[in-house]
Structures are given as C-alpha cells and as structure tokens.
C-alpha cells in the first residue's frame, strides 16, 4: 500500500505572475509527488470554480491562500492514510468532501493540485513514468501539436478577434520532427513580421501578437511563414483556429461582433464566415466556433462543417461529461478540448476523454493561458493516446516544458512510439 503520510499546499506564481496552487504529497516510502495547477483567461461559465481570496490588498484579489488552507487542513485530514494508487477512490473522496456541483467550496484549484500530486507520487512509487502509469502498456501514441503562433482576442492586446491561429505539422513521422517543423515556422514568421515592421512581442501563450487588418491577412502571413520555412501548406502543415467566440458574442442582440473587421454577424452568417475561411485556407480544426450558450449556432456550424473540419468544444463542454453527453446526443461539435482545471480531478478528466472517444469525438489535451512549469498534460496526452495536444507556441518555458517532456517520452518509448499525423482527425472525411 502506498499510504499518504503528508500533504503540503502552497501559493506559487503562474506564467502571468498570478498566484496559483502547488501541492506536495509524501508517501510512506518517502516518495513525493508535486503538482501545480494552471489558470485560464477566457473561461467557460460552467467550469469548476477556481477559488480566489478576493482580498484586494494581496495580488489584486487573486491570492489563493484559502485554497491552500483547504489543502493543509480538511483535505489533508480526509485523505491522510489513503492509498495513493487508488486514484478514483481518492478523487471521489475529494468530490464528496467538497459537496458542491462546481467545486466552489474547496476550489477546483485545490482539489486538482492534490489529485495530480497523488498520481505523480503513486507513479514514482510504482517505478513508472507518469504516462505509463496513466495508460499502461498501450500508451504509445504521440500527439500532433496545435502550435499557437499568433495570439489575438483575450490572449493579446491587438486588433484580432480570433484568439488563436495555430499550425499543426501532419506529415512528420515523429513528434521530434513535428516540433522542429513548428519551431522553424515560428522563426520564419518572426522574420516576416520584423521585415514588415510589425511587432514580434508575444502574448500569454508565446505566440506573436501583431496588429493585422483582418483574420485573412493573419492567415496569409502564416501561409508565407510555412512556405518560407520550406514546408508545404496543406500537405506538411494544416491550420487550426480557436475563435473563443463567447468573448465577442453579444447575447442581447444575438450577434457576433468582430470589432477588428467592423462586422456584426448572426450565427448563420458567422458560420458562413468560418466556412469561407475553410474554403480559402487548409483549416482542419476550429475551437469554440460559436458561443458556449449558442447551441443553435453550434448545430448550424456542425451541420455546415462537421464532416470536414474538427469542431472542438472548449467553453462549450468544459471537460464535463454531463455537458458532453448532451452535446453528443444533439450532434453538437465533433471534438472536446480537455482542460484538467475545468473539471478539477484526474478521474473526471479521464472520464471525459473516454466518453468522447466512445462517441467518435476526438479529444485535444490542452494547457491554459496561465501556465506553470508542470508538464503533466504531456503525460496525459500520451497516456490516453489522445492524439492531439494544444500547449502554446515555440517560446516561453511554461509552454516549452510540455514539448520537452514529450520529447523525453518519445525517447523513452523508442521504436514503439507512433505519430498519427493526419490520422489524428479520424472522424473527418
């Protein structure tokens, strides 16, 4: 038995300089697991609640001392002595202890830090790499990365309404090759922007954040960068978008307002707008193409593009099996974004991935805009054979830490490692 003998919660900083929760879990054998949780900028309204102190005299109210206190007192008392290898039982203990639908009492940030730290300690105790502990002997598929090389929306202070413009290397035969492709495109884009006198400052997720006149101009510039780096757009590299449409949806008027382009569009018109972009560019994936509450708009978008484009629900599904099941039943989207802090425990995270796969939906493992050096999501991506990961651009060590962990995992897997390329989109025609 891997009995838990000590738990320590602490307040640390994330990549935006805001407080977040870190937890150490010590086992009877002397083995320790440590985990730190991320935080989002554009968040879904039905996400599990991240507990903040609200004390304006500390960190502008964003302190997490209450969440840390919960770890060091009642959570510690509830799980002390439990077997760290019984992840599902431990997570259920946390959920029952919290007692709310959205984890608002203890805080999803406190609960997730403990859930992750316990898993890491148990993996260490078992002498297994974390991805192998999660996935057993069947974990061998590396993920295709969605690399966010241009940031807009809530992730940057510029004129772009769409939040993320991403490249996906699909012709590579290994993750290492895919990472090199992304890095070379990133540097080619930097040179193009610099030559045009445009900003090469980066946003929260490490992508560039220049002012473009339109989303099309941005996409055209990315195409130039791909070609400048020596790759074929549409063959070697595909494009992906995160619209984060909830951020520019005006519910009272039922319109999508693209301020950067001076457009006010109905759901149907915005679906047509996105379809037009897909006709002009090799876009294989669109995340949050409609607002989280606009299910009619989502249905319109799915009917229009769902057979040829991966339509990823982030704010829509918030890694929640109840909401995902409703979406599956109604034929909304065809993919789910998996963010561990949206739901607050590893067990519930794995349940959402499993439900998606059973329904023929893809699952994309994702970071948050406020990250830490914790690289657990890299191990989750491989451990669940998810096939796709979204963890930022090719700059900022809070993003690179995940890519570097994936390089280590691929090296550890050796000849049995596989890279899915275009087959990651197994539900598209």
UniProtKB/Swiss-Prot annotation:
Q: Which residues form the active site?
A: 205 (proton donor), 339 (proton acceptor)
Q: Which family does it belong to?
A: Belongs to the enolase family.
* PANTHER family reported in the protein's UniProt record: ENOLASE
Q: Which UniProt keywords apply?
A: Cytoplasm, Glycolysis, Lyase, Magnesium, Metal-binding, Secreted
Q: Name one GO cellular component term.
A: extracellular region
Compartment(s) of residence:
Cytoplasm; Secreted; Cell surface
- Name it: Enolase
Spell out the HAMAP family in the cross-references: Enolase
The pathway that the record names for this protein is: Carbohydrate degradation; glycolysis; pyruvate from D-glyceraldehyde 3-phosphate: step 4/5
Name one molecular function that GO assigns to this entry: phosphopyruvate hydratase activity
Name the residues that bind Mg(2+): 242, 287, 314
What role does this protein play?
A: Catalyzes the reversible conversion of 2-phosphoglycerate (2-PG) into phosphoenolpyruvate (PEP). It is essential for the degradation of carbohydrates via glycolysis.
């Amino acid at each position: 038995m891997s009995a838990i003998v000590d738990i320590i919660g602490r307040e640390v900083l994330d990549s935006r300089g805001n407080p977040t929760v870190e937890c150490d879990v010590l086992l009877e054998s002397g083995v320790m697991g440590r985990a730190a949780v991320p935080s989002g900028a554009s968040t879904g309204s039905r996400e599990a609640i991240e507990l903040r102190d609200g004390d304006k005299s500390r960190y502008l109210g964003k302190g997490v001392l209450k969440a840390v206190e919960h770890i060091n007192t009642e959570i510690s008392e509830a799980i002390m002595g439990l077997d760290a290898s019984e992840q599902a039982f431990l997570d259920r203990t946390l959920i029952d202890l919290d007692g709310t639908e959205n984890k608002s009492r203890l805080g999803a940030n406190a609960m997730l830090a403990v859930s992750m730290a316990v898993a890491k300690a148990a993996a260490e105790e078992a002498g297994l790499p974390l991805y192998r502990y999660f996935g057993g002997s069947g974990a061998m598929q590396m993920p295709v990365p969605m690399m966010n090389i241009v940031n807009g929306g809530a992730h940057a202070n510029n004129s772009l309404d769409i939040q993320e413009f991403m490249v996906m290397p699909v012709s590579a035969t290994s993750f290492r090759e895919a990472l090199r492709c992304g890095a070379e495109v990133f540097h080619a884009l930097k040179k193009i922007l610099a030559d045009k006198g445009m900003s090469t400052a980066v946003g929260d997720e490490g992508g560039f954040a220049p002012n473009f006149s339109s989303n099309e101009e941005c996409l055209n510039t990315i195409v130039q960068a791909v070609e400048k780096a020596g790759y074929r757009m549409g063959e070697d590299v595909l494009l992906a978008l995160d619209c984060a449409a909830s951020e520019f949806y005006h519910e009272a008027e039922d319109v999508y307002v693209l301020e950067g382009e001076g457009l006010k569009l109905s759901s149907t018109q915005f679906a047509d707008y996105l379809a037009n972009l897909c006709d002009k560019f090799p876009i294989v994936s669109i995340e949050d193409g409609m607002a989280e509450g606009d299910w009619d708009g989502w249905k319109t978008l799915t009917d229009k593009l769902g057979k040829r484009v991966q339509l990823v629900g982030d704010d829509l599904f918030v890694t929640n099996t109840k909401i995902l099941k409703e979406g599956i039943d109604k034929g909304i989207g065809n993919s789910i974004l998996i963010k561990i802090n949206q739901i607050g425990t590893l067990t519930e995270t794995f349940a959402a991935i499993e439900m998606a796969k059973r329904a023929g939906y893809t699952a994309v493992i994702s970071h948050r805009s406020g990250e830490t050096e914790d690289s657990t999501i890299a191990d989750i991506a491989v451990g669940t054979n998810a096939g796709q990961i979204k963890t930022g651009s090719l700059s900022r060590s809070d993003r690179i830490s995940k890519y570097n962990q994936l390089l280590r995992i691929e090296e550890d897997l050796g000849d049995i490692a596989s890279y899915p390329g275009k087959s990651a989109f197994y539900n598209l025609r």
